[in-house]
């Protein structure tokens, strides 16, 4: 529980404007300049999101959403990062939701379980809120603007 409390504290700090950017992380601003969007996440949603993430997602995606080190290796079934350093931000919101609900497979083999029978729509939204709070501001801004416009984020 102490680790979850620490993760919640980090998420709250990120929400309050103290975002982190890992060296070498992909940057949406390289694709096109965008002005920042509001990053006001509900504290309750963040708390629920981190709790649910730790229960259902952390085993594969890592306790801090960092993903498996071999996530880019096509020879390895490894969960990608959800902290903004992977490709999740390049997906439309409805695509992220569909993957969480229905799972994912590669060459017909399941690589992520379907959570539609265990997680409600609100649970999924809270989990996404938590990991999106970890995204660098430029990436989150790009994702929000592209989703509002109906475009697939590029980068």
At which residue positions do the language-model features occur?
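Electrostatic cytochrome c docking/interface patches
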Residues: 21-52, 150-155
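Sec-dependent signal peptide recognition
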Residues: 2-9
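Short sequence/structural segments immediately N-terminal
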Residues: 52, 135-141
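Gly/Gly-Pro-rich "capping" loops immediately C-terminal to redox-active cysteine motifs
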Residues: 64-97
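C-terminal motif of bacterial Sec signal peptides marking the signal peptidase cleavage site
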Residues: 15-17
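Sequence/structural segment immediately N-terminal to covalent heme-attachment motifs in c-type
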Residues: 41-66, 73, 96-98, 155
């Amino acid at each position: 529980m102490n680790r979850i409390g620490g993760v919640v504290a980090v998420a709250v700090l990120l929400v309050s404007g103290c975002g982190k950017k890992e060296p070498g992380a992909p940057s949406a601003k390289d694709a096109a300049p965008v002005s920042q969007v509001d990053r006001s996440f509900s504290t309750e949603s963040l708390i629920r999101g981190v709790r649910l993430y730790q229960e259902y997602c952390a085993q594969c995606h890592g306790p801090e959403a960092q993903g498996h080190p071999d996530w880019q290796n096509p020879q390895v079934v490894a969960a990608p990062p959800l902290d903004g350093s992977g490709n999740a931000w390049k997906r439309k919101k409805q695509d992220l939701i569909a993957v969480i609900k229905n799972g994912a497979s590669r060459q017909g083999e399941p690589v992520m379980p379907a959570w539609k029978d265990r997680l409600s729509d609100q649970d999924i939204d809270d989990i996404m809120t938590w990991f999106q709070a970890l995204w660098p501001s430029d990436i989150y801004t790009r994702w929000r603007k592209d989703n509002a416009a109906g475009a697939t984020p590029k980068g």
